[in-house]
Curated annotation (Swiss-Prot):
Induction description: Constitutively expressed. Up-regulated in the shoots by cadmium. Down-regulated under zinc deficiency.
Keyword Transmembrane helix: yes
GO annotation, biological process: response to oxidative stress
Topological relation to the membrane, as annotated: Single-pass membrane protein
Protein name, entry field: Protein PLANT CADMIUM RESISTANCE 2
Spans through the membrane: 57-79
Subunit organization: Homooligomer.
Keywords: Cell membrane, Membrane, Transmembrane, Transmembrane helix
Result of knocking out the encoding gene: Strongly impaired growth in the presence of heavy metals such as zinc, cadmium, copper or iron.
GO CC aspect terms: plasma membrane
Disulfide bonds: none
InterPro entries referenced in this protein's UniProt entry, alphabetically: PLAC_motif_containing
Amino acid sequence: MEAQHLHAKPHAEGEWSTGFCDCFSDCKNCCITFWCPCITFGQVAEIVDRGSTSCGTAGALYALIAVVTGCACIYSCFYRGKMRAQYNIKGDDCTDCLKHFCCELCSLTQQYRELKHRGYDMSLGWAGNVERQQNQGGVAMGAPVFQGGMTR
């Protein structure tokens, strides 16, 4: 699927739309991330990778890295950098790694909230969001009407 950009709510250019420690502003995601961070990571990775990585694959790889090394934050901090680059959010790789190392859950929930704030329905995945956007565009715009029929 080709890359689509959803309409985002306005916020300061170059800034995260929510704070790093605003985990409880979305209690459902906060609980899911606390008990199973691989789910939140998988959802974020699928959107950031624009569907080239599935939620299940990214989440399973995250869980495997966490079980084998205990350092899944190394994997997830790359996605924070990738997301910052896509949305022109201020920051640097060193700070990304520090945030993921010191508070992985806060980092993951902030990324999740950012994508949600930018118009993504995280439960739909990339393909579902693209389809939703196309359906909304199709309904709002409607089919063009031609007057006069065919002529030579």
